[in-house]
Amino acid sequence: MAKKSMIEREKKRQRLVAKYASKRQELKAQLASAETQEEIMSIHRQLQRLPRNSAPSRLRNRCWLTGRPRGYYRDFGLCRNALREMAHQGLLPGVVKSSW
């Protein structure tokens, strides 16, 4: 199980990404249509003033059950350990053991 502080930090990042998504998208659109070097530099400065944790690239996928950051399966939102346990218990509809 991941530390509570790491899970909360990740939740805070998700809130910041959602809060600043429109502002960031607007600035990037302005950057694409900017013509002069001064405009480009000004827009870059505005982007740099946004909180660092509001960048989507700083998000890390975590298991919703354990908070584990590695071995994450997007389809389920679970890490491999939790996925295995829940599949064995029959808690994931449509998931069956493979046999060939």
From Swiss-Prot:
One of its GO terms (cellular component) is small ribosomal subunit. Pfam families: Ribosomal_S14. GO terms for biological process: translation. Keywords: Ribonucleoprotein, Ribosomal protein, RNA-binding, rRNA-binding. It comes from the Bacteria. The keyword Coiled coil does not apply. SUPFAM superfamilies: Glucocorticoid receptor-like (DNA-binding domain). GO terms for molecular function: rRNA binding; structural constituent of ribosome. InterPro entries: Ribosomal_uS14, Ribosomal_uS14_bac/plastid, Ribosomal_uS14_CS. Part of the 30S ribosomal subunit. Contacts proteins S3 and S10. Belongs to the universal ribosomal protein uS14 family. Binds 16S rRNA, required for the assembly of 30S particles and may also be responsible for determining the conformation of the 16S rRNA at the A site. This is Small ribosomal subunit protein uS14. It comes from Thermosynechococcus vestitus (strain NIES-2133 / IAM M-273 / BP-1). The lineage of its organism: Bacteria, Bacillati, Cyanobacteriota, Cyanophyceae, Acaryochloridales.
